[in-house]
Amino acid sequence: MKKIFMIIAAMMWAVVPMLADEDRMIDREDLPKKAQVFLNEYFANAEVVYVKADREMGVVTSYDVVLMGDVKVEFSRGGEWTSVDCGLDRVPDGVLPQGVVKYVSSKFANAHVVEIERNKFGYDVKLSNDIDLDFGINGNFLRIDD
């Protein structure tokens, strides 16, 4: 009996960690509908390199999409974008809050947004000139982030 218990415990010890953080490659069509619409609207012609579902304890927590041209988009579990990284290229203006577009075009006319991250407090924006900016949830400028 003791031996059986030890075998079961050893099997559980081996299997549980595998379930805990099992990231899985999926097809673009398996993304939430909101994520698919976002990709079709802003990156319709970009070829998908891979789509990964990030999992914790067997539950999908987020999605990572990598497109040709060094574009990376992260989505929440529900399909809302959380970050868009276009490498050295411009993040499409339609992705950006209007306040971000206006501020960057007026204060940094020779730069463009190459990366944006959305969180519960607002937006973190990286410009092509390596300046990082913080914006509030309504797109209002807060500070230059150093």
Regions found by a protein language model. Give the residues of each.
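Bacterial Sec-dependent N-terminal signal peptides
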Residues: 1-23, 39
